[in-house]
Each structure stands twice: as structure tokens, then as C-alpha cells.
Amino acid sequence: MLLSLGSNGNFQLGLNNDEDVYSPQIVPFDRAIEKISCGGNHTLLLDEDSQLWACGDNRKGQCGYEVKEPLYNPLSPDYLRIFTRVSHERWVFLTCGWEFSVIVHADRRRVCSCGEGLSGELGQGNRSNSQGLREIDIPYLDDKEFIIDISAGLRHWICVTNEGNLYGCGDGRKGQLGPVVMKTVNKVSFLGRIEHAQAVVCGVQFSAVLQETGHVIVLGGEKWNVAAECDAWQANNSELSSSICSISANWSTLSLLSTEGCVYAFGRCDRAQKAHTKASDIVQIASGTEHNILRTKKGSVLIYGWNEHGNASNDDKRDVYDAKTLQLPGWAYIVAAGYATSWIVIEENHK
């Protein structure tokens, strides 16, 4: 069962209405879910068969959904009110920025983008808008290289390969694409190599790469001291640093999750972005614009941070400074967060 809450002015919660929601609501989607990613006002997911579905704002083509025969198809392509199948192909990764999406094919080598990218984030050269999924070229991949993770910020994205190579495009003016590309680029570029890289996340003006050793390398991040705080913490806590197993990024805050289930956060904290629980049983953290949602070993869900649209489940719209437990009708096994949206996938009869 899929649940959603938060900002919904463009049908991005998949509830067949455009009203903001302050508590988890059941989404009319009956397939098992593997992955969820959220953009400014759109949402993508991969189902159990690795097929792509989307809902929300599609005016710039960011959902990848095209009406090829509008005279015979009454569905408006501008807004997808419920999750709609976009492609019958198989995909493995997906990520969304403000008004664009990037999806990785099941072969982990082919990449498609769609939507609008005024800062080059589509990776389609001078083409800044694509109404449907369009394959983009990553010319540097060798025969044995494949993508193992991908993430998008507001106007940039980065993928990392099994060889530790980083590729990406979009806005790199604040160092978020790394020191090699300190500019805006509209074609996928080689950004550098990080030994044993296994995951990447993107904020607005920074990106971060997690190595197998638990060490985290921050690209950009001067504003809000994301890089400085993270680097200092790692230098002073080498044993804890080696236990980091997952990372997550808000627009201006970086969170790290350890194998012991603890969360450490660096950067901006004006909207309770660091107000994480003291609990030590966290197994997943998902970061939205400026709020976070945590999943515990026991299948419960905690949430905190910015709450203007009810995305942190306070109906008074006040930010949540003490992580609160959501009341759910089942055991949570996936959490996701977007641009003022929150998502939980639950199993009702978990044993």
C-alpha cells in the first residue's frame, strides 16, 4: 500500500485531487513499488516489474508522458491526476529535479531525460525541453562500466559508476558538479573519479559521494557550511565516520546514516532539518526539500522539518522540531520525500 501527504497543488500526490494533505492518505495504486523520486510538482515511481509510472505536473514534459494521438485520447497530458504508466520498458534508477527527470535503463548504461532544463540539466545539448523520454549520450562509459547510483538536485544531476567515475550535467557554478566543471554544462560531462564510490546525493548547491569505507566527499557546499561541517565531523570522529552506510540530501542539509542506526546532519537548520530523533534503530532516511522521513527496524516512521504544506504531518503547518511518529496502518518498508511531499510504502499484514 502506498501512502502520501504534503503539497498537492499539481496532483503530485497521485490522489486524483489537488488539495494539500496533512496526514498519510492511501494512493490508488495497486502494484508493488521498488523506487520513488519526486520533482518540483511531479512524482515518478518504478513498480515491481521495473516499469515507469508518473503523476503530477507534466506541462514541461517532466513526467515523460506523451499523448501521441490527442484526438482519440481524452486524457490531458498537462496534469496526471493519478499514477499513469509512462513506459513499458524496464528501468533501474530514477531521479527528479525541479522540472526535469532522469531515468536509467535496466542495462544500467542507457540514460533518458525529459522535462525542461534551462541550466543544461537535460544533458541534451542546446535542447532545453523534451516532452517525452529522450536518450542522452554518456560517451565516456567503457565496455565494462555501468551506473550504480544517480541523484538530482534542483538543476543538476550526477551518476556514479562501478568504476568510481562520476558523470553529470546542469548547474555547476557553486561546485556541485565538482572542481573540474565549475560552470553550467548542457551535455553529460566526466566530473572526476572517486575510489570505491557507492552512492551519490545532490542538494541545490552541493553534492555528496559515499565511499565503501564510509567516508563522504562533499562537492561544493560552501553555503550553509555543509562541506566544512561534514569534513570537520569526519576528521574528529574517524570511528563513527567509518560506520556510515547511507547518505541523504535536503536542498541545503546533508544527513548521514550509520550502521548503528544513528543520523548525523550538517548544513542549514532554520527549518528543523537537523531535528532528528535520538533513536538508534534507523534503517533508512529520505530527504525532501527541507524535511526528512526516517524508517526504523520495526517498520515505524518518524518525520521532522519544514511543514508548510503538511508534509511533516502537522495540520497547523508549523515546522516539526521533535521527530514525530506517524500513525500507519501497517509496517513501512520504503520511505521517500520530495518537494514538500512525503511517501510511505507499507505492508499491512507483516509478520
Curated annotation (Swiss-Prot):
It is found in: Cytoplasm; Nucleus. RCC1 repeats lie at residues 1-48, 50-106, 108-162, 163-212. GO terms for biological process: tRNA wobble uridine modification. InterPro entries: RCC1/BLIP-II, Reg_chr_condens, Ub-ligase/GTPase-reg. GO terms for cellular component: cytosol; nucleus. It comes from the Eukaryota. Transmembrane segments: none annotated. The keyword Nucleotidyltransferase does not apply. Keywords: Cytoplasm, Nucleus, Repeat. This is RCC1 repeat-containing protein C10F6.04. It comes from Schizosaccharomyces pombe (strain 972 / ATCC 24843) (Fission yeast). The lineage of its organism: Eukaryota, Fungi, Dikarya, Ascomycota, Taphrinomycotina.
